[in-house]
């Protein structure tokens, strides 16, 4: 009799797994949150291996509190570790840098008005006096740099001042 018993066909065991999905497919799907290494899917900020077959496992991980916490820490670390570009570092004008520039310009202007050659700034006695008695006086460069960098500025400033007085 067993031969004549009709049994129902086996139910299809359809799971919710994608059969032909690779970790690289999930990386392109979820963007910069994930990365693939050695055929495994990793969360970039948590550095945890994720199941690349189940999309729900990935989305649940990305919504979890631990992921959001670690992501914030990861981004904070990246901000601290990033190097500043050289141009940004050079353009940074702190109050000390602006004061230094104004002291040097005033020194060049004083030398020009008193007919003191800029080479006199290289004399050891002048250097000692400036460093002892003038605030930021030790930061005044040698005469060749004064001539190259600061003399043209003083010349332009004086020309503008004279042209504004002539009007």
Swiss-Prot record:
Disulfide bonds: none annotated. InterPro entries: Cggbp1 (IPR033375). It is found in: Nucleus. It comes from the Eukaryota. Its main location: nucleus. The modification Phosphoserine is found at residues 56, 164. A motif (Nuclear localization signal) lies at residues 80-84. One of its GO terms (cellular component) is nucleus. Coiled coil: none annotated. GO terms for molecular function: DNA-binding transcription factor binding; double-stranded DNA binding; identical protein binding. Keywords: DNA-binding, Nucleus, Phosphoprotein, Transcription, Transcription regulation. Residues 65-86 are annotated as: Disordered. GO terms for biological process: epigenetic regulation of gene expression; negative regulation of transcription by RNA polymerase II. Binds to nonmethylated 5'-d(CGG)(n)-3' trinucleotide repeats in the FMR1 promoter. May play a role in regulating FMR1 promoter. Binding is severely inhibited by complete or partial cytosine-specific DNA methylation of the binding motif. This is CGG triplet repeat-binding protein 1. It comes from Mus musculus. The gene is Cggbp1.
């Amino acid at each position: 009799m067993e031969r004549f018993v009709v049994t129902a066909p086996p139910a299809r065991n359809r799971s919710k797994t994608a059969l032909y999905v690779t970790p690289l497919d999930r990386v392109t799907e979820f963007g910069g949150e994930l990365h693939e290494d050695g055929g495994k899917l990793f969360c970039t900020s948590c550095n945890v291996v994720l199941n690349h077959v189940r999309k729900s496992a990935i989305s649940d991980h990305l919504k979890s509190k631990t992921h959001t916490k670690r992501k914030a820490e990861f981004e904070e670390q990246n901000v601290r570790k990033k190097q500043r570009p050289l141009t940004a570092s050079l353009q940074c004008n702190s109050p000390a840098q602006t004061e230094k520039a104004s002291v040097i310009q005033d020194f060049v202007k004083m030398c020009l008005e008193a007919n003191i050659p800029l080479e006199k700034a290289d004399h050891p006695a002048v250097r000692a006096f400036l460093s002892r008695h003038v605030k930021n006086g030790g930061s005044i460069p040698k005469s060749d740099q004064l001539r190259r960098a600061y003399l043209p500025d003083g010349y332009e400033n004086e020309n503008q001042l004279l042209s504004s007085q002539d009007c």
